[in-house]
A protein has these predicted regions:
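Short alpha-helix boundary/capping segments
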Residues: 33-44, 165
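Gly-rich Lys/Arg/Thr-decorated short loops/hinges at beta-loop-alpha junctions or inter-strand turns
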Residues: 20-34, 155
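Acidic/polar active-site rim loop that often engages polyanionic ligands
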Residues: 25-31, 56-57, 111-112
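N-terminal glycine-rich anion-binding loops that anchor highly charged ligand groups
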Residues: 14-25, 47
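Histidine-anchored nucleotide/phosphate-binding helix
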Residues: 39-55
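Short amphipathic alpha-helices and their capping/turn segments at secondary-structure boundaries
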Residues: 2-17
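Short connector loops at secondary-structure junctions
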Residues: 27-28, 51-55, 62-68
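Hydrophobic alpha-helical positions that pack around
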Residues: 10, 59-170, 176-181
């Protein structure tokens, strides 16, 4: 997380991208933001994936989704059928599969050597939220100032996902979930 998108899209000259991998595996077990984003914006995400493929000059992309999200797998597979070179890859639920190196291994069976960059495997990995943000930036001329986030936990009466502006105080989101006891 927090690795600049433009750096991943411009790998060092010694490396050549062979595919894009979209990380649709929530990095923590209680998160559901990516799941909700896929259910609500599958078409836009596919357009974003296509744009990412063009940016790194590849004709193959994989979207890794854990198999405990069958509705997202079904929808994303249906939508991907309309796009050349995009394949949804159902993955076994295995923490921490959302890590970039683990995801590369799970999707294309290549390991990132110790001290090496993920691009050394030929894969450029981006998050499903990034694919959606790329769609919005390129197709809608909308800068990234908000994102879907999950606010959850046993102390909340109504755990929820929110489309929140970057910088929204956590107290405001917690209060929207019924507050803390």
């Amino acid at each position: 997380a927090c690795f600049p998108t433009q750096v991943k899209l411009c790998p060092p000259p010694a490396f050549k991208a062979e595919c894009v991998i979209i990380n649709a595996v929530e990095c923590e077990p209680y998160l559901t933001a990516d799941h909700q984003l896929m259910l609500e914006h599958a078409e836009e995400i596919m357009v974003g994936v296509s744009i990412l493929m063009k940016a790194v000059k590849v004709n193959k992309a994989f979207i890794g989704i854990e198999n405990n999200k069958p509705d997202a797998i079904q929808l994303m597979t249906k939508v991907a059928a309309g796009y050349a070179g995009i394949e949804v890859v159902p993955l076994k639920v295995q923490y921490p599969q959302g890590g970039e190196k683990q995801l590369i291994d799970a999707v294309i069976s290549r390991q990132v050597a110790a001290g090496a960059l993920p691009i050394s495997t030929g894969a450029v990995v981006q998050n499903v939220g990034t694919a959606f943000a790329v769609y919005q930036a390129v197709q809608k001329n909308k800068p990234l100032f908000e994102r879907v986030i999950t606010v959850t936990g046993k102390s909340l009466s109504k755990p929820s996902n929110f489309l929140a502006r970057i910088g929204t105080p956590m107290k405001q989101l917690i209060d929207a979930c019924g507050g803390l006891p």
